Amino acid sequence: MTKIIGIDLGTTNSCVAIMDGSKPRVLENSEGDRTTPSIIAYTDDGETLVGQPAKRQAVTNAKNTFFAIKRLVGRKFSDQETQRDKDIMPFDILESDNGDAWLSVKGQKTAPPQISAEVLKKMKKTAEDYLGETVTEAVVTVPAYFNDAQRQATKDAGRISGLEIKRIINEPTAAAIAYGLDKGKGNSTIAVYDLGGGTFDISIIEIDDVDGEKTFEVLATNGDTHLGGEDFDNRLINYLVDEFKKEQGFDLRKDPLAMQRLKEAAEKAKVELSSAQQTDVNLPYITADATGPKHMNMKVTRAKLESLVEDLVSRSIEPLKVALQDAGLSVSDIDDVILVGGQTRMPMVQKKVADFFGKEPRKDVNPDEAVAIGAAVQGGVLSGEVKDLLLLDVTPLSLGIETMGGVMTSLISKNTTIPTKHSQVFSTAEDNQSAVTIHVLQGERKRAIDNKSLGQFNLDGIQPAPRGTSQIEVTFDIDADGILHVSAKDKNTGREQKITIKASSGLSEAEIEKMVRDAESNSETDRKFEELIQVRNQADHLIHATNKKLKEAGDKVSPEEKTSIEQALKALETAIKGEDKTDIESKANALTMVSAKLEEASQQNSSSNNAEKNDSSDVKADAVDAEFEEVKDKK
């Protein structure tokens, strides 16, 4: 059976792991790193870069280098969070035809799942390079507080990348699996505090051990899908920009190139301040005006950074209280606290969490890798590699429909264990009503308009009757991925209408199919590009070796032969500057043919050198070691 890989598709970094025998293993990418920056760039020559290569060129290609795309997945353009990002991101965020937030990629409107798919493709390739076989299935993690739209968009990204997402699991739950896998027997209740690059989650999880079988049951979850390391970076960036403006009288926000350099420097400074009390942000030639070049050189202390982000850290505490309340527990009931996500390395975050729970968080869980490890273990459960593990996750938000008076009536409450199914009977609101509109909602507010609209559908053909007579049974069915299926049935006629909430990612089936085909054709283009690079490298090596032999041969090669070799060298040097693989191979073969004499000359040189060595060794062979005795003169 093929492997089901585990992928942590993060806002800032992504990570892939597999089950290697009975142990999960995090895989290194082609750059030798265990995590990959979730950065995608589209270059002028049509190449798509992912990870470190994309990050390295971001300064000179800011408009077409995309990061933190996870914050836009499954969101509407009009969302408050989207509007906030729109003003600070160096790339363009646009409104799609159906109102979703899309991006401008080299002037083309592109859906966020299509861009996220490039990161998934990189994870897929990393696993395939290690395993030596094709990978088609994965378990992918999402923030626990992702709504239905965001989950569906993640599944769409998987399809576009060529992966069937067998299961979507929540990031804190995956981290709990990684933590609980090797722990001894006994039951425990843990809190997973997950503050990543763009999202924040808190989950209260009970781990039960019965006769060696571990059950991970999520009791409650809460969070904020727009709070993370990116927000911390932006606070520091804004501070540096404002200080620079005071000193130099120039607003760096007008210079996209400078802002990209500043983003990298701010991220680096934030990381350094987790272990140092002070750091320098030194950016020579950050910009220029009529008076000449401008340089940035500022000192930033840990205390200053903490004062800039204190309210962000405090924002993460309120969901902790709600999650504990929903789980029916108090702080004293929590046995262990697990920190996940790179932003939890900040000492201020660790202190706030420790103060809230009254205990120090565990330090034996890698915050960057735990989620991918948990996803790989769940992949092992689905493929049958891992036994004795049961995962019981929950839906993060209540689900219901709009009823008379614009009220949301919940059918499934938040923190209900999934998969689950629930039905409720409603009646018609008017006399002789022949159709009803089922408006599906997700959220905790009483007014329907204040909740997230997931979609709507009509049930027609209801028999005319006085209001309140016709009975409509509405059924909500949530699968293990947390994705919702809704049906409405007229109990009098048996007429039924069903819907799977799919439109939420903003992509129709036809659009997804087209993107899948585009991705497949791109993978063929990528393969051809790799072959071209390989042939170019071989040709470069041949040119270098031929030049060296030509120099060594000296007058052992006739002037005519030398001229033909030099012409063939020049032809190959010209060919490798082009894109025609066949032409390069042809010119390389021609050079190999005309330089055959060089090979002979090289062998002659080698033979004569060996002969000289043999002559010298013959002299040594005739020599005899003599014993001698020192005779001292008598005094």
From Swiss-Prot:
Induction: By stress conditions e.g. heat shock. The modification Phosphothreonine is found at residue 199. The keyword Nucleotide-binding applies. Keywords: ATP-binding, Chaperone, Nucleotide-binding, Phosphoprotein, Stress response. The keyword Phosphoprotein applies. Pfam families: HSP70 (PF00012). GO terms for molecular function: ATP binding; ATP-dependent protein folding chaperone; unfolded protein binding. Residues 598-635 are annotated as: Disordered. InterPro entries: ATPase_NBD, Chaperone_DnaK, Heat_shock_70_CS, HSP70_C_sf, HSP70_peptide-bd_sf, Hsp_70_fam. Residues 601-611 have a biased composition (Low complexity). Residues 612-635 have a biased composition (Basic and acidic residues). Belongs to the heat shock protein 70 family. HAMAP family: DnaK. Acts as a chaperone. PANTHER family: HEAT SHOCK PROTEIN 70KDA. This is Chaperone protein DnaK. It comes from Hamiltonella defensa subsp. Acyrthosiphon pisum (strain 5AT). The gene is dnaK.
